[in-house]
Each structure stands twice: as C-alpha cells, then as structure tokens.
C-alpha cells in the first residue's frame, strides 16, 4: 500500500470540495479543504503539504496568482483545476508553478492517476 499524501484542496464550490475530499480520503489520503486563496496564504504548514490541488477560479484571487505566491513556501506537487483546458490555459498553469493542469469536470480516476506518480514530500 502506498504512503498517504497530505493534500491541501483549495476549492470554493462546496459540493465539489466535498466530493473531491471524500474521494481522496477513501483513497487513504489526508485532506484539508479550504475555500479561498487568502486562507491558503495564511497557513503556516505549507512545508508539510505533499500536494496542493487548487481551483483556478477562486473568489478572491485566481489560482495562477495564488500559486506564484505559494511556490516560495512549498515544494508540494501542485495541480491546477479549471474548466478551461486550452493550450494557453495549460501553459499558464505550468508557468505559474503548477506541475499538472486537470480540466474540470474530471472523473476521480483521472485525479488518482496523477497522484499515483507523486512522492510524499516529508514522510
């Protein structure tokens, strides 16, 4: 069995956040779900996070700007989630510090496939 990942989920849509959290927890991961970028920026445990899974369309800041601000404080594997999947959107995610761009809606298996290749940062 693989080592559980510590995942910070940044998603303002409550139903989506709950669905993703339940799936990830069922897969054995530890999930902390927060609704906005300001809450993410205020966390003092970013160095202990293995994965940041963030929506791009947050209410207070777009996910690209958020990742630029978070990246100096964490080496976590970062996955952008967006309804936009054009080449320009994907390139913007990568340029902002994300390692992967997941297009919504997605099936849970697609997320687990990405996570399968992520190594825990500090176990």
Identify what each model region corresponds to.
Residues 36, 62-65:
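Acidic catalytic/metal-coordinating carboxylates
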Residues 47-53, 58:
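Active-site beta3 strand of CheY-like receiver
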Residues 11, 35:
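Conserved acidic carboxylate
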Residues 106-115:
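C-terminal output helix
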Residues 59, 86:
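The feature encodes the CheY-like receiver
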Residues 64-75:
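Short amphipathic alpha-helix used as the core "switch/output" element in two-component signaling
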Residues 18-26:
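Charged docking surfaces used in two-component/phosphorelay signaling
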């Amino acid at each position: 069995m693989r080592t559980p990942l510590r995942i910070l989920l940044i998603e303002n849509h409550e139903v989506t956040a709950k669905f993703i959290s339940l799936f990830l927890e069922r897969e054995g991961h530890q999930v902390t779900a927060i609704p906005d970028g300001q809450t993410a920026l205020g966390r003092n445990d970013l160095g202990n996070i293995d994965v940041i899974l963030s929506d791009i369309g947050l209410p207070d800041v777009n996910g690209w700007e958020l990742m630029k601000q978070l990246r100096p404080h964490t080496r976590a594997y970062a996955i952008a989630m967006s309804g936009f999947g054009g080449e320009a959107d994907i390139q913007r995610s990568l340029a902002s510090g994300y390692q992967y761009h997941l297009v919504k809606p997605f099936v849970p298996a697609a997320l687990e496939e990405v996570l399968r290749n992520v190594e825990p940062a500090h176990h």
